[in-house]
């Protein structure tokens, strides 16, 4: 082909990028080798990066013309060399340093070497005889590293020539691992020579020879899964030889010296660069532990101190170099400990958290380029497989495999995962590993990041043979990531179904899997967090038995639902509640459709059922409400005007107060359940929930009162109203909160006594018709004048007379949150006007302020339940609700007359105004607000979790963890939540004591 015929188009089609210089370089290569350009182009076309192959070939010819020209004398030899250096600049750099090693590619590599062949070859490189090298230190290191790299480029040549490198990946990885083991053995032989003799750091040769020293391969080295450039994880073990005069302590000293020198031979700087890092940090105690231990010391550590992840790391351990028999003893002795580790408490959770931490620690800029650690990467496959192995390997020795691919095959063979899933996982894993291999081969550098440069991605596509262009490769990679992530997220759970699915035909088993035994299924359930695996298995059996449409859909859905249940605080109760719900709704078309088609609804259902007994019990009474879980809009609090419209419609439909009240109680149950859903699933803040719960209670009272008044037909005789007090008046109700109220009436046509009797009858009807055993309503009138000693209902004039003559400071303070919630609007307006005169005095004397502080101190002393820890009481404790509310109310009593914005029944609104007006600093207000919100959330969370009201932060860790989960803490964070609460309230208490009591005036308190 002439220069004119060598067009840029031809060069581009051949894969060249730097077209401006390629033509001249091709002509130079043709001149130096004697090959016509027509022969060189196909040879370069076989290279992943033709530009680099051409450039490096010219460098080799210039650097070592004789060796390179000799090697490039045939087209086949040239093609083989160009393919290697076109895929690996690192290999070319090796040839430039050691031109004579070009001869290593003189013949095609048609088969992978055995471990024995590699070990013999590398020991020969250092002249090893009887385990001792005959070559001196620097010379030995160079000889070892050159021989290693000779073998490495031969392996690369074999790898690059494969027709199907995906299928051949595991053979190449095994050979690379064997090569690493051989290098360690050769370096150990050099180390023995260096450690023998007299002087510092040396020992008598006889003692060195007698010291038993084994190098245990961990991770990919142990599993024979190494990359071209991997850190090689190792653990060192020794044993004394008393008969040879080497006691254990002496053996540890000698072996430690051997370990240090062996590592140097592999990784320290020298004429020929180091090979890779030898990483011994998986040893007992990590970096802080002894580099070398005796076998007995290892066993003692793993028996007493080792954590769960350390046993997972040992899963791949094998004897890699040194004393083979000692290494096998180490592996054999630790195997029972490895395969029983999954039975440790919280083992699975700790491993899962470790996996999450790995992802969390990836820099944001690298996350989407990570082949290994990111979502859908290699670690997702390896993590899933290892977790399945550790769980099922407790009872099944066949799954105790070191390498990922063999383990996948064994798990499928034993029916712990489906064969199709195993095949998909296996193929995707091989593909990801091939990408990793080719990336590392490029520069013989350790990396797990996909290139960001399009040219580099195109080179990777050519090197792997997976795609013709960069875009195609990235598309394929993203598909693999999505597929791997999906399998990772569900694979661990799916096989549970086959243990209980009563399918008459074995061929109809789920995903083609054979069944697990009951014991195996129970072990899996226990491993993922079920406390009663036998009971859980019974529920699964009931849900999936038979051939009905419901059973079929639930068989398909339950695997992932079990995963979601296990992520909840109480998976057992969640599964039980799901079974009950399915028994109620399983025959309805919409329920089955929702389960099948709406993964969002199914996941939300598992979250609320496993996270709240309150919700589960209430949902059992309103099962149709599960339909809300499909729609975010249905999970938000309903607007008050919509509730009022529904209430008006109910009152219009029902002639009887009893039937109307029953319908209104059902509305309340329904809306409280909606709010519980909303809070647990994160659709509402604590303030929104408080307003919503207050509106629902207000709506119930409005409706029931309207039904009672209509039935009595006494509107002309008297006016009647309900005044909300406390948290109800402030629109601050939580789940399980009492509704503090007062009743007021005003005679119209009736006389005072008759009106009072009528009002008393209305109150009795209200108490009777709002009573609900399914969701109790506690109408508390304890804040009325004279407290428990006062009448349950008063006329407006009676209130006016009382407040004018007898009102105590606490009663005026209680009125700060008084708000009309139901009844005649004119009466409500007049009552609130009266309340304003009492609660917003033009001035408040020092005596009254002291009285407020005295009462608060008395409450701290007397109202706390006996034995209650004041630091943990959410309502009356230090820095909790009471402190914040009393502080705000004192500010209102002192300043609301002059500052109308303070005239609000809402604690948080008043606190914000107080900060804005300068009555409290912004920082102090923020601390008070944080404590009030935390305590309010915790009170509601305790009701949701236990279905009981409580005011004391529990000590029970199970309950505390359930509460913490509802407060959006991660699993196992009970102590963290507890510490956060105590810290928040401690800061709030400091503000309260300083700003409310003031150091000189603060009364003594024993609380």
Curated annotation (Swiss-Prot):
Required cofactor(s): Mg(2+)
Keyword ATP-binding part of the UniProt annotation: yes
An individual GO BP term: regulation of glutamine family amino acid metabolic process
Superkingdom: Bacteria
EC code: 2.7.7.89, 2.7.7.42
GO molecular-function terms, A-Z: [glutamate-ammonia-ligase] adenylyltransferase activity; [glutamine synthetase]-adenylyl-L-tyrosine phosphorylase activity; ATP binding; magnesium ion binding
Region Adenylyl removase, residue ranges: 1-496
Recorded catalytic activity of this chain's protein: [glutamine synthetase]-O(4)-(5'-adenylyl)-L-tyrosine + phosphate = [glutamine synthetase]-L-tyrosine + ADP; [glutamine synthetase]-L-tyrosine + ATP = [glutamine synthetase]-O(4)-(5'-adenylyl)-L-tyrosine + diphosphate
Region (Adenylyl transferase): 505-1007
Keywords tagged on the record: ATP-binding, Magnesium, Multifunctional enzyme, Nucleotide-binding, Nucleotidyltransferase, Transferase
Signal peptide coordinates: none
Family: Belongs to the GlnE family.
Protein's job: Involved in the regulation of glutamine synthetase GlnA, a key enzyme in the process to assimilate ammonia. When cellular nitrogen levels are high, the C-terminal adenylyl transferase (AT) inactivates GlnA by covalent transfer of an adenylyl group from ATP to specific tyrosine residue of GlnA, thus reducing its activity. Conversely, when nitrogen levels are low, the N-terminal adenylyl removase (AR) activates GlnA by removing the adenylyl group by phosphorolysis, increasing its activity.
PANTHER family, alphabetized: BIFUNCTIONAL GLUTAMINE SYNTHETASE ADENYLYLTRANSFERASE_ADENYLYL-REMOVING ENZYME, GLUTAMINE SYNTHETASE ADENYLYLTRANSFERASE
Protein name, UniProt field: Bifunctional glutamine synthetase adenylyltransferase/adenylyl-removing enzyme
Organism: Leifsonia xyli subsp. xyli (strain CTCB07)
Gene: glnE
